[in-house]
Swiss-Prot record:
Substrate binds at residues 13-15, 181, 221, 242-243. Belongs to the triosephosphate isomerase family. The gene is tpiA. Homodimer. GO terms for cellular component: cytosol. Its EC number is 5.3.1.1. GO terms for biological process: gluconeogenesis; glyceraldehyde-3-phosphate biosynthetic process; glycerol catabolic process; glycolytic process. It is found in: Cytoplasm. It comes from the Bacteria. This is Triosephosphate isomerase. PROSITE patterns: TIM_1, TIM_2.
Length: 262
């Protein structure tokens, strides 16, 4: 598969924002503002709080929207006495296409390890949901100049135990921790450097065909003004967007800018 065949994914991670009523309005605005022709060039997803999923599902399916949706976390367990956890089978019942695993905020605030992230990714894949596996270096690693090796090894550990077929249904998001919510943005060249190295790792793990088909996103203060240069990089296949996805019309503009750049 040539790199040109990878359709960019623009995924909006709402984090802990927007209740289920606000979610309906936001997705309606996004759908209204983004002309249907753009979906031929980019896939657009919203990654929403658990409490919003059923409302978003009802809207997307009822209005036959081309937007896809997913969750921000999943349990590694199938079911049982795990208070507060949500299983992959529950998300599958809601027709989730995606689930983010290993976001830097989960790694930092909930002490999630690479091993746990890999288990969550495998749980999602077992129910037909594509995990968006997040990796990225803190500022001190970037300043030391060891960021490429750090991220490659973090990615290797976060994909441990996944087969080539499973990796073919996995998305990776490179999100330098120092650029998340800080307004600092890695340059497009920075993003390309690391995403290319991640693709090299996937070639090693699963072969060239899987690696060439895998979508690798950049996340970290992505905005409408910066997305075009980011997705123009040969190994960057979209964006994991934070704050810029909370306004439906603004997120539509960002997605349109990405579509126009490919």
């Amino acid at each position: 598969m040539s790199p040109m065949a990878r359709k960019p994914l623009i995924a909006g991670n709402w984090k802990m924002n927007l209740d289920h009523q606000q979610a309906i309005g936001t997705v309606q605005k996004l759908a209204f503002a983004l002309h249907k022709d753009y979906y031929e060039k980019v896939d657009v997803a919203v990654i929403v709080p658990f409490t919003d999923l059923r409302s978003v599902q009802t809207l997307v399916e009822g209005d036959k929207l081309q937007i896809t949706y997913g969750a921000q976390d999943v349990s590694q367990h199938e079911s049982g006495a795990y208070t507060g956890e949500v299983s992959a089978s529950m998300l599958a019942k809601l027709n989730c296409s995606w689930v983010v695993v290993g976001h830097s905020e989960r790694r930092e605030y909930h002490n999630e390890t690479d091993e746990l992230v890999a288990a969550k990714a495998k749980a999602a894949l077992s129910k037909g949901i594509s995990p968006i596996v997040c990796v990225g270096e803190p500022l001190e690693i970037r300043e030391a100049g060891t960021h490429v090796d750090y991220v490659v090894e973090q990615t290797r550990a976060s994909l441990a135990g996944l087969s080539a077929d499973e990796l073919a249904n996995t998305v990776i998001a490179y999100e330098p921790v120092w650029a998340i919510g800080t307004g600092k943005v890695a340059s497009a060249a920075d993003a390309q450097e690391v995403c290319k190295a991640i693709r090299g790792l996937v070639t090693e793990l699963a072969g060239e065909e899987v690696a060439e088909g895998m979508r690798i996103l950049y996340g970290g203060s992505v905005k409408a003004e910066t997305i075009a240069e980011i997705v123009s990089q040969p190994d960057v296949d979209g964006g994991l967007v934070g704050g810029a996805s909370l306004d439906g019309e603004a997120f539509a503009k960002l997605a349109a800018n990405a579509a126009n750049a490919v």
